[in-house]
Regions:
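Short, structurally constrained coil/turn elements
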Residues: 26-28
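Local sequence-structure signature of Cys/Sec-based thiol-disulfide redox active-site neighborhoods
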Residues: 1-24
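Structural micro-motif
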Residues: 48-58
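Non-catalytic, surface beta->alpha helical segment in thiol-disulfide oxidoreductase systems
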Residues: 59-87
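Thiol-based oxidoreductase modules, predominantly thioredoxin-like and allied folds used
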Residues: 30-42
């Protein structure tokens, strides 16, 4: 599983997203790739995924969120993808 973070240097919420994803990547063992939204590839992904402003988060190539990240929602999404929901 890969998480893609579309970011920008002057974006405060992007720094929050990086901190959240650092924690979750360690906890869940997922790969995180960061891409500047102002690059041609970043612009193309943002447009395709409906990312209006950074940070934009994609989970396995699918748009998940943009703007201020929610660690709780992202954690639930990772658990769903990894098959951990409802298991003890």
């Amino acid at each position: 599983m890969e998480i893609l973070l579309l970011t920008r240097d002057d974006c405060a919420f992007c720094h929050d997203a990086e901190e959240i994803l650092d924690r979750l990547s360690t906890e869940y063992g997922v790969s995180v790739r960061t891409l500047d939204v102002d690059t041609p590839e970043g612009q193309q992904l943002a447009e395709r995924g409906g990312v209006m402003f950074p940070p934009g988060i994609f989970v396995d190539g699918r748009p998940f969120s943009y703007g201020r990240p929610s660690e709780r929602k992202l954690r639930r999404e990772l658990e769903k993808h990894l098959g951990r929901v409802g298991k003890t």
